[in-house]
Curated annotation (Swiss-Prot):
InterPro entries assigned: Ppm1/Ppm2/Tcmp, SAM-dependent_MTases_sf, SAM_mthyl_Trfase_ML2640-like
A GO MF label: methyltransferase activity
Family assignment from sequence similarity: Belongs to the UPF0677 family.
Record flagged with keyword Transferase: yes
Enzyme class: transferase
Positions annotated to bind S-adenosyl-L-methionine: D132, D161, L162
Alphabetized Pfam families for the sequence: LCM (PF04072)
Name this polypeptide is given: Putative S-adenosyl-L-methionine-dependent methyltransferase MAV_2576
């Protein structure tokens, strides 16, 4: 289903379904022999979402139909699981470091099925604001409540599309723009138009007190190139056909969800707006540092991304 300016989604459709795939990666990492992260709640979301391609993450072995669709499928799957684990660890470490330095106001943009408010060891007094589509947040909170899981930090759900007036909704939920904030944008930017991405950062800027921090999964202009889009779609179509043979399960065509538009590099934007960029680590370097390097010869296995941290002067 192609995107529209005012589209919405539930957890098992469109952009919402991608959150289940990411939760699947965290669930697989959590039960691995030497996990980088621990997310005991990711599995609960997969089970609660019903039947769908995301349920392959609940099994230790991949279906033969998917493996047969691509001789490199298992290696690609492991690379993406490694990417998800390293990305999760990056943001986990960022938030705990910010809280350790005294920041008590956290805003997770496009929170999806992230469960950091429930699983990280937050210091007393931390408030975690989560912004996402209302149905996505309702599914997450309802699932956790049904398993008697309570948040460790004070948790505030802000159900609103990031293309709408979320700063107003955030303020109405209790956000204090005069206090330093730790912001995150994880797995978000390609789902926004270039203009919407610019507006997102303008709004972060307007709400950030000095001393605020931001962490971003930024994507290079190579990621947004027609060649990269075509390559990803060719791979996805092969997997989609295999998933259908697996039993009618479907894989969303990523090209229908992402916006193929070049945009201002995040590092450049931050530096031009008074932020000190304290880290800008490529996905390859991030993964290699955690012994999750992509095997040589495995092309386009993970997104062309850079993990960026900044502090507002």
């Amino acid at each position: 289903m192609a995107r529209t300016d005012n589209d919405t989604w539930d957890i098992n459709e469109s952009v919402g379904a991608t959150a289940l795939g990411v939760a699947g990666g965290r669930a697989a990492e959590t039960r691995s022999a030497d996990p980088l992260i621990s997310d005991p709640y990711a599995k609960l979301f997969l089970e609660a979402a019903g039947d769908g391609i995301w349920r392959v993450y609940l099994d230790d072995e991949l279906p033969a139909e998917l493996v047969g669709a691509d001789p490199q499928f298992e290696d690609r799957m492991q690379a993406m699981l490694g990417y998800t684990a390293c990305r999760t660890k990056f943001f986990d470490d960022y938030f705990l470091a910010a809280a350790g330095e005294g920041i008590r106001q956290i805003v997770i943009l496009a929170a999806g099925l992230d469960s950091r408010a429930w699983r990280l060891a937050w210091p007393a007094g931390c408030v975690v604001y989560e912004i996402d589509q209302p149905k996505v947040l309702e599914f997450k909170i309802g699932t956790l409540k049904s398993h008697a899981v309570d948040p460790i930090a004070s948790h505030v759900s802000v159900g609103i599309d990031l293309r709408l007036d979320w700063p107003k909704a955030l303020a109405q939920a209790g956000f204090d723009a005069s206090a330093p904030t730790a912001w995150s944008a994880e797995g978000l930017l390609p789902y926004l138009t270039a203009d919407a991405q610019g507006l997102l950062f303008d709004r972060i800027q307007s709400l950030s007190a000095p001393g605020s921090r931001v962490a971003v999964e930024a994507f290079t202009n190579e990621f947004f190139s027609p060649e990269s889009f075509a390559r990803r779609e060719e791979q996805t179509e092969r997997y989609r056909q295999a998933a259908i043979r697996l039993g009618g399960k479907d894989i969303t065509e990523s090209g229908n969800l992402l916006y193929e538009e070049e945009r201002t590099e995040v590092v450049d934007w931050l530096q031009a707006h008074g932020w000190t960029v304290t880290a800008a680590t490529s996905a390859e370097d991030l993964m290699a540092a955690s012994n999750r390097a992509v095997p040589a010869g495995l092309d386009a296995a993970v997104p062309e991304s850079v993990f960026v941290e900044g502090r507002l002067r």
